[in-house]
A protein has these predicted regions:
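Loop/turn elements at helix/coil->beta-strand transitions in domains of secreted/extracellular proteins
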Residues: 25-30, 73-79, 142-148, 168-171, ...
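Formylglycine-dependent
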Residues: 105-146, 153-237, 243-252, 264-273, ...
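Bacterial Sec-dependent N-terminal signal peptides
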Residues: 1-25
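Long, internal low-complexity/basic segments
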Residues: 24-27, 34, 39, 77, ...
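Active-site-proximal N-terminal segment of extracellular/periplasmic enzymes that hydrolyze or transfer
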Residues: 24-76, 153, 464-472
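Metal-dependent active-site segment of extracytoplasmic phospho-/sulfohydrolases and closely related
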Residues: 236, 242-243, 278-317, 342
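Short, structured active-site-proximal loop/turn typified by the sulfatase FGly-forming signature C/S-X-P-X-R
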Residues: 49-91, 97-99, 146-147, 168-177, ...
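C-terminal cap/loop subdomain of S1 sulfatases and analogous C-terminal strand-loop tails that border
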Residues: 172, 310-334, 344, 349-364, ...
Length: 508
């Protein structure tokens, strides 16, 4: 593995390099990522009232996620946790600790073709992650961890280094490739093997072909095997458990369809709900395996979705799939970027040395903002490994917040830069404290950009644009947004003559 990473990088983080260590010396870490799972796609309530108490919403009554409930009781969940609005940018941000504007994978990666979209930046990073990105699994590997990737990768296009997670710093890759969605969830269909068609088949799971093993279960079984091997080798492990669920196609997991019979919901919405419950079963099975192996108290689980929800319950700018929030995956609204985030020890034990070193509040809700960029430094903090020298981070550790405390030093802003066409097109959104500005570039009419402003403390569901009434605040946030874009060396949309469209402020 080491020879696959640029040798010139070794000196950059030699302070983090160790020989293989014993499992008793470092905790195990599982990052459990669910594709296209939004904040509301669960029975665990993340919406809070003014006092920070959870408030159940109708969608929380629709979904069944008992193992997420189990995990939440054992740990802390964040009511306000931000991801990028689509998958590839989020996954790159998780792996690098950098915002999409900086790593420049600002759109989802279409495996075969550059999906820059008509006015997208010419030099956006379609090829995705490379071995020079210093993703944190590689840093962990150098510190003696066994690093395991199971499931969706979507780190790069076909033929790129990022198409195979083993090129980036994982010892083991099972089922990860350039594809962003499975051809099928059914083993009977070979998880998408279609003769003569572009392959969306999930690789490496041939042993389950022609069986009734649902994809989420196949991935869980493979993860269990790798955990067992790491335990036998007496090595601490990092598991990137990255489900293809709940991305389309919305195929029914027949084991759970009896739970979703609301005649007001369409068939696809019911199928989506079964994918959610099947994913939740995987979480429970994994937690049970950790208990069975006697390593649960030494294993931290970080659970999250990779972008806003995509439930087939409404459009990109309404209050359907993410209700009461507006929008869904790919949109500029809160429903497009807010995701579930839970951190817990797999078996809480106040006397455990790892848990003493990294305490996690139990059955708690953290209302302070976190982002996917914070995962990189947080994971390394759990492992007791230093961030590589000269590696730029846009996030910071969530250690104090995970312990249930407030962290005044933690950033209270989030920049979401999407210079492409999608459900929400050519926009930058910027949240600072309670205020959120959405700036729209206008490639076909470059002199007529426009913007919206929301006060999320008074209007969390983005129903009232107050830009005209709050011009001073709009201009203030615009200035902070531009400063952040420049700091991260962002690329911008272009017009029909390929001129870069930099943001400028127009008073209303």
């Amino acid at each position: 593995m080491n020879g696959m990473i640029s040798r010139s990088l070794m000196g950059v983080f030699c302070s983090a390099c160790f020989s293989v260590v014993n499992a008793q010396d470092r905790p195990n870490i599982v990052v459990f990522i669910v594709d296209d799972m939004g904040l509301m796609d669960t029975s665990v309530p993340f919406v809070t009232d003014y006092h920070g108490n959870a408030v159940k919403q109708p969608l929380n009554e629709w979904y069944r996620t008992p193992n997420m409930e189990r995990l939440a009781k054992q740990g802390i969940r964040f009511s306000t946790f931000y991801a990028q609005s689509v998958s590839s940018p989020s996954r790159a941000s998780i792996m690098t600790g950098q915002n999409a504007a900086r790593h420049r994978t600002t759109n989802w990666i279409q495996p075969e073709n550059n999906n820059r979209t008509p006015y997208g930046p010419l030099d956006w990073n379609w090829k995705g992650l490379t071995r020079n990105n210093l993703i944190y699994p590689y840093v962990l590997e150098q510190a003696g961890y066994k690093t395991i990737h199971v499931g969706k990768a979507h780190f790069g296009c076909i033929g790129s280094e990022g198409a195979d997670p083993k090129n980036l710093g994982f010892d083991i890759n099972i089922a990860g490739s350039a594809i962003g969605s499975p051809g099928s969830y059914y083993g009977e269909n070979g998880y998408g093997v279609i003769k003569g068609a572009k392959s969306r088949a999930v690789p490496g799971l041939e042993q389950y072909f022609h069986t009734n093993t649902f994809l989420s279960d196949a991935l869980t079984l493979e993860a269990d095997k790798e955990i067992e091997k790491a335990v036998a080798e007496k090595r601490p492990f990092y598991l990137n458990m990255a489900h293809y669920a709940v991305h389309s196609p919305f195929e029914t997991d027949k084991r759970f369809i009896g739970h979703y019979t609301d005649p007001k919901k369409n068939q696809q919405a019911c199928a989506f709900a079964t994918l959610i419950e099947g994913m939740d079963k995987s979480l429970g099975d994994l937690m049970d395996k950790l208990e069975e192996l006697g390593i649960a108290e030494n294993t931290l689980i970080i659970f999250l979705g990779d972008n806003g929800g995509d439930a087939p319950l409404g459009g990109a700018a309404d209050y359907g799939s993410s209700a009461p929030f507006k929008g869904k995956k790919g949109s500029e609204y809160e429903g497009g970027v807010r995701v579930p985030f839970i951190v817990a020890w797999a078996h809480p034990d106040a006397e455990n040395k790892f848990q003493k070193a990294f305490p996690v509040a139990q059955n708690a809700i953290q209302t302070q903002m976190g982002t996917v960029m914070d995962i990189y430094p947080t994971v390394l903090s759990v492992a007791g490994v230093k961030v590589p020298e000269n590696h730029i981070l846009d996030g910071s550790t969530l250690e104090r917040m995970i312990a249930g405390k407030k962290d005044k030093a933690h950033r209270d802003d989030f920049l979401m830069h999407f210079p492409h066409e999608h459900r929400g097109s050519y926009f930058t959104s910027y949240r600072k404290g309670d205020w959120k500005l959405i700036y729209y570039y206008n490639p076909e009419h470059p002199d007529a950009p426009y913007y919206k402003l929301f006060n999320l403390s008074e209007d969390p569901y983005e129903k009232n644009d107050v830009a005209k009434a709050e011009q001073k605040k709009a201009k203030e946030l615009f200035g902070l947004m531009v400063k952040r874009l420049e700091m991260e060396k962002a690329l911008y949309p272009i017009d029909k003559d390929k001129n870069e469209l930099r943001p400028f402020f127009i008073a209303k």
